[in-house]
Amino acid sequence: MRIAVAGGTGTVGHHAVEAARERGHEVVVLTRSNGIDLVSGEGLDDALRGVDVVIDASNLITTSAKKATEFFTTVTRNLLAAEQRAGVRHHVSLSIVGIDRAPYGYYAAKLAQERAVEAGGVPWTILRAMQFHEFAGQLLEGLTIAGVHLAPRVRTQPIAAREVGQRLVELAEGAPMGHAPEIAGPRQEQLADMIRTLAHATGVKGPVMAISLPGKQYAAMRRGETLPGPGATIGHQTFDEWVAEQASVTQR
């Protein structure tokens, strides 16, 4: 099978590329370095020639709801239009658990992406995943004021990005199924505890302070409204196991 991966160098996308190659598929990585611009659509027609399935794990890190919505809807429509021209049979899109239950600009953008996929004319599968273990590291780096690391008090059920990438490939190998069962890690965690654990394991200096961030999004997360529902696919690697794995790699 010939599989194209948008966002194929990202947190999940590079794992999807690895998994697809390990399973014997021919992989096309849709990146600017390969002459493909997802936002303008440049290079997509040539890249998707002969492709059977497209996995979209593309992402934009932004706090602007407008920018996020423009990015996800534009990229999705460009992909779907090029897929129709190329005769692609299946579009697999990565989304997030709970985006319809927590009011947040980025989540609204992902919902808009889902609607574009549903209306796009290419048979589709959408996989909603929980936050990745790597999310704790992003917050550890990004939420720091005067040497103090701020850790939001929220509940999550994080999953290894590698397992999400593998699941995307499994779905790509099957028939389009609409909304696939959500995917989450094996254990619920407090995000503040995750950040403390990672800081200790990686030698990050400075105190970690748990805080209750304002806003309806964080209130919904504290209440557990963005946790997976019944029937979710449950991964294997816990956050603690992932941290130990990262520490082992660093020490080599």
Task: Give the predicted meaning of each segment.
Residues 1-25:
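N-terminal Rossmann NAD(P)H-binding glycine-rich loop of SDR-like oxidoreductase domains
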Residues 12, 54, 161-168, 183, ...:
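Non-catalytic, hydrophobic alpha-helical segments
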Residues 21-86, 96-101:
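NAD(P)H-binding glycine-rich loop region in Rossmannoid oxidoreductase-like domains
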Residues 90, 95, 100, 112-135, ...:
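Conserved beta-loop-beta element that borders a ligand/cofactor-binding pocket
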Residues 125, 138-159, 163, 175:
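A conserved pocket-lining segment of Rossmann-fold NAD(P)-dependent short-chain dehydrogenase/reductase
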Residues 134-146, 171-181, 204-206:
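Glycine/proline-rich active-site loop of Rossmann-fold NAD(P)-dependent oxidoreductases
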Residues 150-155, 181-188:
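Glycine-rich Rossmann NAD(P)(H)-binding loop
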Residues 188, 195-252:
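Mobile cap/lid helix-loop segments that border enzyme active or cofactor-binding sites
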